[in-house]
């Protein structure tokens, strides 16, 4: 059995999009490390099930439509009233669209950008006064390997994830004097609901994936990752082990980026 040292004991953490997938993996890891968590998500039933499964009183759920600024403001008002401070913000929430330039409507483009890029900006902005009260404030962005490479057919998602990586750098420089560290994690192929394609097939079961990534050794570890793999990287940035690290992006991708 893995021994947990509770290295985040009583740390106050907000995880956006924490009800499922990578977000749920992050919540599980951080609560096991002793953190108190607010899940900000629109998926209420999934969040409640996660809290029930973890059997803990250290998690609160705030139903939040992260595409709406007023709901983000209410989220941080709740955090202020409930805790008075925030130690760690994990900007994890994201949606994927799968459209190319020619078939992407501006409305759908903007909707993806609102959740994937605007929301991390707004959450970071409204978290700032609470993070300043912490002696070890952290902002962690969940980007993607798609934010550092060209990838056909996902224009708004890729653009937003690339923007998150540069937002990480900018905020790291801007907030260093406030002792707030800002880093990002860029997952590769992770086994979540977002890896299910429109036709219902898993991405890594398709012929094109096998040809491009396995046959030509573009995925050196030859397997997909799991939310726990990403959660471990997030924990590093939450912990004192990263106290002299800011403005960095850690790729959790099984070696894909090493083949670029």
Where on the chain are the PLM-derived regions?
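Active-site helix of classical SDR
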Residues: 124, 160, 168
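Substrate-binding pocket helix/loop in short-chain dehydrogenase/reductase
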Residues: 100-101, 105-110, 215
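Short C-terminal tail/terminal secondary-structure segment
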Residues: 2-4, 149, 235, 246-260
